[in-house]
Design a protein with these regions (language model features):
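Metal-dependent phosphodiesterase/phospholipase catalytic core, i.e.
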Residues: 12-13, 60-161, 165-167, 203
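Conserved, mostly hydrophobic/aromatic
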Residues: 18, 36, 47, 87, ...
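N-terminal amphipathic alpha-helix/helix-capping segment at the start of soluble metabolic enzymes
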Residues: 1-17, 152, 198
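Hydrophobic faces of well-ordered beta-strands that scaffold small-molecule active sites
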Residues: 15-17, 44-46, 112-114, 141-144, ...
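Alpha-helical segments flanking ligand/cofactor-binding loops in enzyme cores
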Residues: 30, 34, 102, 152, ...
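Conserved N-terminal beta1-alpha1 strand-loop-helix module at the mouth
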Residues: 8-60, 68-72, 126-128
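C-terminal active-site rim and adjoining tail of enzyme catalytic domains
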Residues: 91-98, 163-246
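Active-site beta-loop-alpha junctions enriched in small/polar residues
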Residues: 20, 49-53, 61-62, 117-119, ...
Length: 246
């Protein structure tokens, strides 16, 4: 009888609610974020833009057009051209409103991956983060972005960790992340490979892929030993991890 070592157990990644539990509630709304927390997400993910008067607001697109409800008083417009007062009149699906980043960070019981969609918003985001109570869940948040200059501003002015979003994992992306002092890299799950994940981990960075919504994508994420799983459906990922990892 020969001695055979057992394979190392798969680590259990943290579940990140992508725009909240956006499979079950209107994306990037307080309802979606609450649902994600109820469904077992350990972190939330949101997108932020600047309003015309400098308010950091939570929305993915540059305009309200795609997510606005059909009966909204205001149905079209760019976030950067609308004031906070105008955005307050916008009605989203399910009767939800456009939240501010401050509102989300006040209500959350978990850290947030805050995606800065435009580099110009970085300073305002930094000011909000700096003002957070040290012991609050939101104080453990991470800023993520495709814009290296936005992440550099966050690193320069706050103690908040950052994760560099990339379309492809290569030597240049890893080098940029290290130069930024980033805690991780966030590639699309569609381009993630075991070789890429190993290179990121060897560089001392976390692997934070997006967006995992199918069984094949989940299997890739687990095989790559990712640190977080960003998904539209935290409850589904929770069930899958329970079955696969116990």
């Amino acid at each position: 009888m020969t001695n055979q070592s057992s394979p190392a157990p798969l680590q259990r990644p943290a579940i990140v609610g992508h725009r909240g539990a956006s499979a079950h509630a209107p994306e990037n709304t307080l309802a979606a974020f609450r649902r994600a927390l109820e469904d077992g997400a350990q972190l939330l993910e949101c997108d932020v833009h600047l309003s015309a008067d400098g308010e950091v607001v939570v929305m993915h697109d540059e305009t309200i057009d795609r997510t606005v409800a059909s009966d909204s008083p205001l149905r079209t417009g760019a976030i950067g051209e609308l004031t906070r007062a105008q955005l307050d009149t916008v009605l989203l699906e399910g009767g939800e409103r456009v939240p501010s980043l401050a509102e989300l960070l006040e209500m959350t019981t978990a850290p947030v991956f805050i995606e800065v969609k435009v580099a110009a918003a970085a300073q305002a985001v930094a000011e909000i983060l700096t003002a957070l109570p040290k012991g609050s869940p939101a104080a453990a948040s991470t800023v993520i972005s495709f814009h290296a200059d936005a992440l550099a501003e966050i690193r320069r002015t706050t103690e908040t960790p950052v994760s560099y979003l990339v379309g492809q994992v290569d030597e240049g992306a890893i080098a940029t992340a290290r130069e930024l002092g980033a805690a991780g890299i966030g590639p699309s799950i569609k381009v993630l490979s075991l070789q890429a994940a190993e290179a990121v981990h060897e560089a001392g960075l976390a692997v934070n892929p997006w967006t995992v919504n199918t069984v094949p994508q989940l299997e890739v994420a687990l095989a790559c030993g990712v640190d977080t799983i960003t998904t539209d459906d935290p409850a589904w990922v929770q069930r899958e991890l329970d079955v696969r990892l116990g």
